[in-house]
Amino acid sequence: MSGKDGTETPVIAETSRTLEDGNCESDKNSESVDHSAMPESESELAASTGRRPEVKPSSDLETSKVQETVSKEETQTGWGYWGSWGKSLLSSASATVATVGQGISSVIEKAESSLGIPSPSEISSEVKVAAAETNTRENEDSSLGAGPFGVFSTISTAVQSTGKSVIAGGLDALEFIGKKTMDVIAEGDPGFKRTKGLMNRNATLSQVLREAKEKEELWTSNEVTMETDKNTHYGLLFDEFQGLSHLEALEMLSQESEIKVRSVLNSLSGDELETLKLELEQLKEAFSLAEFCDEEEEEKKGDEDFTKEVTELFSQLHVSTKPEKLTRARNTAYEWIKAVPAKTLAENKEEEKQLEGGNTEEVSKNSIEDIHAFAIRSLAELTACSIELFHKTAALVLHGQRQNVTAIERSQTLSQVTVVLCKELSFLSREFTTSLTTVGVKEKTDSLNPLITAVFLEASNSASYIQDAFQLLLPVLELSLIENRTESPTHELQVQKPLAQQ
Amino acid sequence: MEAIWLYQFRLIVIGDSTVGKSCLIRRFTEGRFAQVSDPTVGVDFFSRLVEIEPGKRIKLQIWDTAGQERFRSITRAYYRNSVGGLLLFDITNRRSFQNVHEWLEETKVHVQPYQIVFVLVGHKCDLDTQRQVTRHEAEKLAAAYGMKYIETSARDAINVEKAFTDLTRDIYELVKRGEITIQEGWEGVKSGFVPNVVHSSEEVVKSERRCLC
């Protein structure tokens, strides 16, 4: 596995990391995953990489230029902007195919063919089907905890069964996601399909998301829907918080940087080129997000800690932008959740006294829908804020004042930021689902579980958007590394000046 | 329903740094005036719906660019995908008025092959006592470039609505007359979603009548 070179190396490395993650859970389990996964994932991967360069239906001059250079780059190093997209996508794709098999892919297929984002009930019913299809396999594996499959099977069990004890299973799954955000990219059904579609259609992430949003718009305007209905459409909300625009702007910076980096590489030769390539290689390593298996850090942290952690990480980046908007949005979300159970419990009690049963369900039904709507809104807002931060960081890395921090240090910090953000999203989604469970205690599972599933799905989508946006920063930091190299003599002069004055 | 609009226009706001671009946009989109604001990094985004005729809404997507020179290479890239623009100068800062030529020259180079409908905005008109640019010379300059001229104040909320809605109306007219068309791969004008058929057929009837005249 390690002996491969060229295009496949990074991809396989990624796949193996996913599998190693499985190891953290239980040895017995990951073994079974290992055996079935390896051959399939490799063939899937080879097929995909082989297929990709053929798809060149570009009308735009610019894109075709990019594509040309991409295929060239692929044969050379297998990295670069598009290359790394391929890397993360392929690995997640192959992991899913290998471990999940037909069941889940049919879910994904159907979900995509219906709408940009399928309704929660739709997903849940599909998951039910998937669960039935993959039941045999699940029994063989006899596990809920390992690999991407584990998450889904847990959730499908939750959907299938009735009674409250099941929800605990669903929450376990969400807890599990915290450790496995990398794997989750694959299962975040609509998002995964969107990103997978990106590979086939040569579209950018923002284009894909824009299309999904437009589908939602079309749908909401055709259907005579209530205002509240619109409030649960992640895509529309993400755009409302300017997430799409920031993503588009980030993509522009990323593409420009990519072109510049390439032209620099083309202009170099011999030792100079080799040293630079080596440095760029180190930078890429910082972008590989390896630290999702931290058991210790998983424990719940105080409310203040996220704000503190993110603020500190941003000060390490030495860019003038501050994550206040993000931390504010996050804290608002937490305050809201905290206020929820108390309020509804009080309401319920009063209601019970006055009306004795009957209407109480009405009250709590509104409440779980409120929580669901707020959860989706918060996830969309936090994701948009995160992407805005990445966009601002890119602009400042390229055009800010020169700082005493290397591109590699910045990459490492940004990688940590990404991990923190994704963990926070999974934690937040767990808070929301806990809240849903508490408030919807009298609900039928049929109405409660789809909402829980939807929150979980959008949380994993959010995490994958953030990780994709993070990958867009790679060319930006590559360019910054190159510029720092060439400008270092003048930089030294500037440092010496004050000394001479003394 | 709120989410429904006929078109989406992308507008760009440009001009020297500290002329008040972000404050003007915030007043328009958020209805408040921010006393202190950090310089814009690269570009920021805002959006708002504008009702140009009863029941007819346009969604404005506003790109707030950084005025600082160091971000110029970023902001240049945004002209191409805008249908309209507000070119701001500060009436208390002569230099920012003199730079209007430069801004227009720059956009001309980078907007090809499309066009942007610009309005010239003399901002901070509440500070009339510190005025360094007369209304007359600003109007003359605007006319020379075929632009409208308007004076605004974000602090006192003077003409802020008018600046944006007049520009939106002008663009809407051009779109209706077919002088600006929706194009694949261009983000300047996008078609929105019309909720019922009656609405759009009414549209067709109107434009036919227009043709006969």
Swiss-Prot record, chain B:
> Phosphoserine (modified residue): where?
S201
Q: What top-level class of enzyme does the UniProt entry assign?
A: hydrolase
From the Swiss-Prot or TrEMBL record, state where the protein is found. Cell membrane; Cytoplasmic vesicle membrane; Golgi apparatus; Cytoplasmic vesicle, Autophagosome membrane
Documented EC number(s): 3.6.5.2
| GO MF term set | GTP binding; GTPase activity; myosin V binding
Q: Which GO terms describe its biological process?
A: autophagy; protein transport; Rab protein signal transduction; regulation of autophagy; synapse organization; vesicle-mediated transport
Question: How is activity regulated here?
Answer: Regulated by guanine nucleotide exchange factors (GEFs) including C9orf72-SMCR8 complex, which promote the exchange of bound GDP for free GTP. Regulated by GTPase activating proteins (GAPs) which increase the GTP hydrolysis activity. Inhibited by GDP dissociation inhibitors (GDIs).
Please report which protein family the annotation says this sequence is part of: Belongs to the small GTPase superfamily. Rab family.
Known disease link = Intellectual developmental disorder, X-linked 72: A disorder characterized by significantly below average general intellectual functioning associated with impairments in adaptive behavior and manifested during the developmental period. Intellectual deficiency is the only primary symptom of non-syndromic X-linked forms, while syndromic forms present with associated physical, neurological and/or psychiatric manifestations. XLID72 patients can manifest autism spectrum disorder, seizures and macrocephaly as additional features. Waisman syndrome: A neurologic disorder characterized by delayed psychomotor development, intellectual disability, and early-onset Parkinson disease.
Write the protein's name. Answer: Ras-related protein Rab-39B
What is this protein's gene name? RAB39B
